[in-house]
Regions:
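Signature of uroporphyrinogen-III synthase
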Residues: 1-171
């Protein structure tokens, strides 16, 4: 089976390798590019927990004082694994959606215990911070990365796809 993966390569390497090991042909065609935004250093001591909806937020963290024991709420297991690899030890993972992450935070974290830090993309699909603020939490959202479309696919890849049409797309 020929499978096309459209996520950025660093976010797809595990999946690409698994699919290849299962005997599939995999073509990687990223449709977005991720880039760090310059932000001032964040002092984690000002927060009781951090919220991550993407591994990119962890990858592009710019912290003044790192606290490995700070509570980390992660959108899914891949993001939680990235947080652990970055040195965080107090991690919690939801079921892979922003709604399940909001529910996890509301259910397990005292909204009076202090401020939450939400590191995110410049562009988000859901206002997690607004939902938590409406639930009584104090949240600072800082965008530390952005995304933009990839505008050109190289000719070699296009020719390969024309000769080998894909069976499946992973977006």
């Amino acid at each position: 089976m020929h499978i096309i993966i459209t996520r950025p390569k660093e976010d797809s390497l595990d999946l690409i390798n698994k699919l290849i090991n299962l005997g599939h042909s995999v073509t990687h065609i990223p449709v977005i590019k991720i880039e760090k935004l310059e932000i001032k250093k964040v002092n984690l001591e000002n927060y009781k927990a951090i919220i991550f909806t993407s591994s990119n937020a962890i990858k592009y963290m710019n912290v003044e004082k790192f606290n490995s024991k700070i509570k980390c709420f992660c959108v899914g297991s891949a993001t939680e694994r990235t947080a652990k690899n970055a040195g965080f030890t107090n991690t919690f993972s939801s079921e892979g959606t922003v709604d399940s992450l909001i529910e996890l935070i509301i259910r397990t974290h005292d909204n009076k215990s202090g401020k939450l830090l939400y590191l995110s993309s410049e562009f988000i699909s859901k206002d997690l911070d607004t939902d938590l603020i409406n639930a009584g939490f104090s949240v600072d959202r800082i965008s530390n990365y952005t995304s933009f479309p990839v505008e050109k696919i190289d000719e070699k890849t296009l020719n390969f796809i024309k000769k080998n049409p894909p069976d499946v797309f992973f977006i």
